[in-house]
Amino acid sequence: PQISRQEYGGLFGPT
C-alpha cells in the first residue's frame, strides 16, 4: 500500500 515515509521514518521503518 501507499505509506507516507514521514509516518514510518523511512520506507520499511525508522532507520
Curated annotation (Swiss-Prot):
Note on how the cofactor is bound: Binds 2 nickel ions per subunit.
This protein's pathway reads:
Nitrogen metabolism; urea degradation; CO(2) and NH(3) from urea (urease route): step 1/1
Alphabetized UniProt keyword annotations: Cytoplasm, Hydrolase, Metal-binding, Nickel
Any keyword RNA-binding? no
Q: Give the reaction(s) catalysed.
A: urea + 2 H2O + H(+) = hydrogencarbonate + 2 NH4(+)
Q: Name one GO biological process term.
A: urea catabolic process
What this protein is called in its record is: Urease subunit alpha
Annotated organism of origin: Morganella morganii
